[in-house]
Regions:
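Domain-level signature for soluble enzymes in the chorismate/prephenate branch of the shikimate pathway
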Residues: 1-96
Length: 96
């Protein structure tokens, strides 16, 4: 019985690991695009609250099985922070 549970747990964790790999690949691609945006907007502010609100609104209108507004907002708030910091650092490096 315990061996079956351990095997099931191992399989589920392998699925999570695969999803984590996909998520990190997607985040890396998102940052690549964010860098392109930062280069275009060099003279403009990086922070665009209107755009962030639009993204959150669009995502909150999607139908998810388990994601709710609180989870989406929390997750994307962190994604936005990471993206802004990445853009800021990239632009600082260009100015050196």
């Amino acid at each position: 019985m315990q061996k079956n549970l351990d095997s099931l747990l191992e399989n589920l964790r392998a699925e999570i690991d695969a999803l984590d790999n996909e998520l990190s690949d997607l985040l890396d691609k998102r940052l690549e695009i964010a860098l392109k945006i930062a280069l275009i907007k060099q003279k403009s502010p990086i922070y665009c609250p209107k755009r962030e609100r639009e993204i959150l609104k669009r995502l909150s209108q999607r139908d998810f099985k388990h994601l709710n507004g609180e989870i989406l907002t929390g997750f994307y708030t962190e994604v936005f922070k990471i993206s802004r910091k990445f853009q800021e650092n990239a632009l600082k490096e260009l100015k050196k």
